Amino acid sequence: MAIHLYKTSTPSTRNGAVASQVKSNPRNNLIYGQHHCGKGRNARGIITARHRGGGHKRLYRKIDFRRNAKDIYGRIVTIEYDPNRNAYICLIHYGDGEKRYILHPRGAIIGDTIVSGTEVPIKMGNALPLTDMPLGTAIHNIEITLGKGGQLARAAGAVAKLIAKEGKSATLKLPSGEVRLISKNCSATVGQVGNVGVNQKSLGRAGSKCWLGKRPVVRGVVMNPVDHPHGGGEGRAPIGRKKPVTPWGYPALGRRTRKRKKYSETLILRRRSK
């Protein structure tokens, strides 16, 4: 992905760094509309997720995370922009006439062929079970539950690594640094997710953030006491506490938020690095 810098004629162009445009002309049978009823609010209209609202209308693209078209070769026809994720997507034409969207693997170009199955080549974009992959393989779109479809390493530039296989489980190192066990029968896609340079983008202005459906974020220390525990005081005042807290009074910045006694506690060998 190419990053474009513009002539500094306005503050937004001075601070902005935008990605090269990828056209999107989605197929009608692979999209459907989404009904957003009060973004960030529950059925009573109460804000349950702050800093959400507005944004441009989107059509959801149906992505094939399962990759269950076994032993049928497909060809990459287009590489398109998807407003619902930061990775690009590819339109695949399979040999039996079916058409599906998949995540764009890094380095894949129009005209490349892909396939999924049990005895397929270890090639970028191919999907196969972990038991058939050699150690050290870079993978993405990884299943946690057999047949449910890929759930891990799906963001732009994400890549995991297969580091061990023992018994019925395979050991993976995830993009977050977490090391965990997954069934060897689960499938994954070879390679890294494309659009690696997405973190180099700079929106440059507040309006671009609003187009994404994200509202402004206000610090608690500049609020009133009725709005935040950090608020109040004369002029620029400290938070008045030993440690920072959330707007609801719970400890913030360092408190572990993972639920205790989850089923996957025994599957995680090393916590993610911060």
Curated annotation (Swiss-Prot):
GO function terms (MF aspect): rRNA binding; structural constituent of ribosome; transferase activity
SMART domains: Ribosomal_L2, Ribosomal_L2_C
Record localization: Plastid, Chloroplast
Assembly with partners or alone: Part of the 50S ribosomal subunit.
Family per record: Belongs to the universal ribosomal protein uL2 family.
Keywords carried by this UniProt record: Chloroplast, Plastid, Ribonucleoprotein, Ribosomal protein
One Gene Ontology biological process: mitochondrial translation
Keyword Ribosomal protein: yes
Region feature (Disordered): 225-274
SUPFAM superfamilies: Nucleic acid-binding proteins, Translation proteins SH3-like domain
Protein name according to UniProt: Large ribosomal subunit protein uL2cz/uL2cy
GO CC aspect terms: chloroplast; mitochondrial large ribosomal subunit
Ribosomal protein found in the keyword field: yes
Domain of life: Eukaryota
Alphabetical list of InterPro entries matching this protein: NA-bd_OB-fold (IPR012340), Rib_uL2_dom2 (IPR014722), Ribosomal_uL2 (IPR002171), Ribosomal_uL2_bac/org-type (IPR005880), Ribosomal_uL2_C (IPR022669), Ribosomal_uL2_CS (IPR022671), Ribosomal_uL2_dom3 (IPR014726), Ribosomal_uL2_RNA-bd_dom (IPR022666)
